[in-house]
């Protein structure tokens, strides 16, 4: 019996985080990618189990080998589940991480060797507990501790969500979308800043500026000075995270694989999702005659493997499994780069918002929860009832990208906004469900909740100053901003403010409405709200006034 336990325990222990990974990235384990990844892990687990079984109780050397194989199993589990190796490497370098990992393995081998008589029972109990915790719902922890933790903060970025006053009610679904969003936020006690706008048109600049409560003009082109040197999508300084830490809150980050908010100097609990199901996407393309219908099935399966690896991208072991699985599928990653769609985050949004909700309800007070969702970001893959549309067309920058002008531009804008507002109605439904679940829990009655867009819909002629008309400024920069906090009155605020300034006002308090100016081409300070606008010459930028607006007039 003990040998059977030793044979199967490594397999069960290593498969548990893989099962969790499949649940996390919304991929069917029965897909080609699923079979390839599971086969790799199963081979490793069974090989370790066979070695442990064969060597068990075959003298001191045999027991050392058994202890060694089980120690390797536990190390691989730790890396698959928590990214132990890369986390160490981030702090002490690759060589230091390798040395520490080796030392840890030696210590673990010695401990297991000393406890060899009890090892089979220990491994069996650990394997059963892991499998149970992976497959079964743990339930929700709702009992308050003796000392009440600090009120929670819930912070959601809805990528490409235009502001309330930026919604043109004359366009298809516009009036319905505006009413639905307003109704949801009013129902749940929010204050809506109807004329909020972002100072920046690009997410990688807008969101870190908001998280640093920075409403200045000190930004170098398409980059953020809060990013690591030479990086565009990894951010070192996010002062809101630091502020939440000082307030006694644990910071939890829920993000896509496109922008990384986890590498910040503040310690965070990181959840990175990659939710693209390549096989289903390719099947739809073939059925409907889409532009990617001729992509080989192996490339679609590779997309699933890539999603699994990115969803566990802190794991060295998962990266190795992904490499082997990709080779089993006989394809190359370069094939993926030619067609990888930007639609998978949008398709998985309802699922991921539900996962974010579960994490909030599970962890409770004493936590700050940050999430960045690419929704209602293009393309519009859902209708107003959150049913898939099987539509994959990008809608941004109709002149600069699609070459449209005149009547063609106007007609395309009306059409694209119809799809966009339909997806916005889906967003309103999902947010309503989310708020119903979270706010019905008494632990979150005094939570601070912020929901904002990072820029406008970008259904415009383009982003460059030379291309933009007055309405394009609204399309590109108007951004949703809603806040629910004790002491903040419910209702609608029609003052013109940037989301970056609103964050500074909300979290820092007593901030000047005059933006600090550091850019050399701008002298002094400006009392007028303004936006950071690219121009055709990539070496120069423009600071343009953001005039009062109401898109329905």
From Swiss-Prot:
Q: Which GO terms describe its cellular component?
A: plasma membrane
Alphabetically list the UniProt keywords. Answer: Cell membrane, Membrane, Nodulation, Plasmid, Transmembrane, Transmembrane helix
Which InterPro entries would you find in this protein's record?
Alkaline_phosphatase_core_sf (IPR017850), Sulfatase_N (IPR000917)
User: For this UniProt entry, what is the primary localization, expressed as one broad class?
Assistant: membrane
Superkingdom classification of source: Bacteria
Q: Does the keyword Transmembrane belong to this entry?
A: yes
Give the location in the cell.
Answer: Cell membrane
| Topological relation to the membrane, as annotated | Multi-pass membrane protein
Protein name (database record) = Nodulation protein NoeB
């Amino acid at each position: 019996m003990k040998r059977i336990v030793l044979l199967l325990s490594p397999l069960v222990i290593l498969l548990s985080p893989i099962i969790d990974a499949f649940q996390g990235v919304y991929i069917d384990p029965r897909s080609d990618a699923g079979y390839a990844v599971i086969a790799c892990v199963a081979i490793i687990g069974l090989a370790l189990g066979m070695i442990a079984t064969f060597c068990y109780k075959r003298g001191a050397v045999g027991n050392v080998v058994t202890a060694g194989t089980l120690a390797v199993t536990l190390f691989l589990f730790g890396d698959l589940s928590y990214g132990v190796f890369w986390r160490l490497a981030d702090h002490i370098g690759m060589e230091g991480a390798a040395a520490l990992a080796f030392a840890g393995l030696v210590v673990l081998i010695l401990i297991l060797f000393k406890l060899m008589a009890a090892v089979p029972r220990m491994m069996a109990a650990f394997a059963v507990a892991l499998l149970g915790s992976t497959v079964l719902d743990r339930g929700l922890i709702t009992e308050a501790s003796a000392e009440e933790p600090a009120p929670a903060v819930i912070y959601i970025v809805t990528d490409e969500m235009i502001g309330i006053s930026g919604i043109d009610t004359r366009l298809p679904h516009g009036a319905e979308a505006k009413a639905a969003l307003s109704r949801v936020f009013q129902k749940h006690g929010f204050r809506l800043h109807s004329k909020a706008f972002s100072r920046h048109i690009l997410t990688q600049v807008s969101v870190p500026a908001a998280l640093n409560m920075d409403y200045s003009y000190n930004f170098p082109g398409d980059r953020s000075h809060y990013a690591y040197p030479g990086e565009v999508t990894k951010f070192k300084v996010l002062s809101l995270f630091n502020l939440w830490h000082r307030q006694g809150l644990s910071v939890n980050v829920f993000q896509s694989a496109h922008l990384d908010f986890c590498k910040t100097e503040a310690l965070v609990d990181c959840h990175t999702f990659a939710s693209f199901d390549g096989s289903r996407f390719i099947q739809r393309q073939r059925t409907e005659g889409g532009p990617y219908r001729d992509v080989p099935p192996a490339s679609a399966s590779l997309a699933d493997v890539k999603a699994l690896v990115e969803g566990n991208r802190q794991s060295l072991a998962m990266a190795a499994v992904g490499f082997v699985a990709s080779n089993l599928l006989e394809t190359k990653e370069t094939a993926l780069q030619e067609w990888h769609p930007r639609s998978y985050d949008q398709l998985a949004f309802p699922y991921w918002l539900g996962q974010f909700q579960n994490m909030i309800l599970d962890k409770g007070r004493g936590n700050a929860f940050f999430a960045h969702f690419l929704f209602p970001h293009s393309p519009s893959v859902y209708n107003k009832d959150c049913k898939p549309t099987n539509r994959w067309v990008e809608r941004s920058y109709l002149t600069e990208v699609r070459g449209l002008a005149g009547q063609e531009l106007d007609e395309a804008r009306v059409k694209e906004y119809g799809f966009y507002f339909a997806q916005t109605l889906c967003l309103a439904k999902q947010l309503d469900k989310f708020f119903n679940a979270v706010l019905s829990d008494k632990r979150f009655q005094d939570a601070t909740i912020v929901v904002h867009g990072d820029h406008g819909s970008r259904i415009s002629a383009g982003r460059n100053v030379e291309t933009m008309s007055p309405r394009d400024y609204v399309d590109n920069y108007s951004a949703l901003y809603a806040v629910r906090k004790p002491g903040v009155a419910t209702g609608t605020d029609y003052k013109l403010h940037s989301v970056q300034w609103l964050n500074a006002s909300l979290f820092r308090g007593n901030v000047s409405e005059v933006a600090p100016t550091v850019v050399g081409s701008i002298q002094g300070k400006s009392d007028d709200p303004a936006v950071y606008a690219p121009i055709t010459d990539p070496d120069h930028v423009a600071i343009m006034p953001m005039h009062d607006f109401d898109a329905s007039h």
